[in-house]
Amino acid sequence: PGSGVVAWPASALLTGNGVALITRVPGTEHGDWLSTRGWYVFAATAALSVRSKYVIRLGDRPLFNPSNLGLVLAFLILGSGIADPQDLWWGQPSVGLTVTYAVIAAGGLVITARLGLLRISLIFWSVFASLTGIAAALGHDITARWSLGPVSGWTYWSTVTLSPEVLIFLFFMITDPRTVARGRRGAELYAIAVATIGALLVSMQTTEFATKVALLTALVIVCGLRPAIEACGDRPGRIAMVALPVVSVTVVLLAAPRQAS
């Protein structure tokens, strides 16, 4: 105050970019990158996200990942007719899609490695991919607007675990330094929890929209449990006591897959 210096709103821009990367307004034509259709959805979601950063706090940090919380609330309140996460499937293999994967992967690996958070992304993906593989092997499938029939088997697994949208989630959302559980062991338990709860919630869904929202919701739940996760992380023996039963129960629940009608 009174310094005459205008601060660059880097944090708000990052939150807004997170909202923009994930959100899609139905009816927008593919390739119309400069469309202003549904601009108020983006603006309201970004504003809610930024506001939550300063209102819902635990000590000196926000309790929830701001863009993640804003997105989940927007999707649940507005529904798929007004606000929809980007499709999990981004099209047939092409030069453009290859470049997209390369940019996301290279950027994610470099940034998370420099922040010392790469292990969180790797642990999350390993657990999530394994549990999702169990669901796929047991026959779980979903409906999607880009598929004429149910998405199942290898197609289901690869679409859910290797989607550019999921890569954005694991590289740039769950690794937010301000909302990751503190401590090495706490951070690892945090990654396992997001992956396990995410896989469980995803296995209960039969539509692509619900699948995407379920994964995002898992991070909201785990961030809310962060104090307990950090407490467990402070005592190494508790990690196995908590993580193994949770993963085991999840595997059992995955054994009863839901199929799209």
Language model features with spans:
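Central hydrophobic cores of alpha-helical transmembrane segments
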Residues: 67-72, 121-130, 186-196
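Internal active-site segments that recognize and position negatively charged phosphoryl groups
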Residues: 78-137
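Loop-to-transmembrane alpha-helix initiation sites
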Residues: 39, 92-99, 120-121, 157-163, ...
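Internal/C-terminal transmembrane anchor helices
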Residues: 238-258
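Glycine/small-residue-rich hydrophobic helix-like segments
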Residues: 140-205
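Alpha-helical transmembrane segments and their membrane-interface exit regions
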Residues: 45-55, 71-76, 104-107, 127-132, ...
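C-terminal ends of transmembrane helices
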Residues: 1-4, 48-62, 105-117, 170-181, ...
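Membrane-interface helix-loop-helix junctions at boundaries between adjacent transmembrane segments
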Residues: 3-94
